[in-house]
């Protein structure tokens, strides 16, 4: 959850997801495939799932190892942000605990480049259609 977590934050996240869904619908109506890149927990995942229940909706969790994630974090320009580094660790722990409890395909992207990760997602989409 975002910090600090408040009702206002929940409302803003819900509006953000609603707007993403509406924009996605514009593209779906014209025959395009749509990917929404978002960091979601159970509540937003349910919101997306409900909105797209009549579409071919798939969810993916990109979950590299904590070691790989922290290495990527440390290679960033703003790597001196200890609060964000701690948040990264907390999110990894949370998603690791939830990974088998929600309806999404988990991809370990530890050793994958961006292009390889995209290829893996496409392979998963082809295997489930």
Regions found by a protein language model. Give the residues of each.
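Short catalytic-loop micro-motif centered on adjacent basic/acidic residues
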Residues: 34-37, 106-108
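Small-molecule kinase domains that catalyze NTP-dependent phosphoryl transfer to phosphate-bearing small molecules
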Residues: 75-120
